């Protein structure tokens, strides 16, 4: 008699692989958001409690939308990417009041030098 059950070792390994991927993604999101907050504070003296952050991933990378408390209808969009030296770089895309502008790479402005 042969059993048609999958091996528990395979299921555990698969679950650990998925869990590792999710934890890596959450760690990257946290690290990049922290870097964005520090960059905005250091370069523009903007405190973290002045805005709300929304996160998404698209074909260009990690996108963060900032909504300031005093500008509810405007979203500011930033990408946090890595340069060839594996350092984080904050790239400002722009702002829109409708929330659905097309992304074009040539409109990006890098906030921190060295990229």
Task: Describe the residue ranges of each PLM region.
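Hydrophobic membrane-insertion alpha-helices, especially the h-region
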Residues: 8-25
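Structured, soluble extracytoplasmic/luminal domains of envelope-associated proteins
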Residues: 76-115
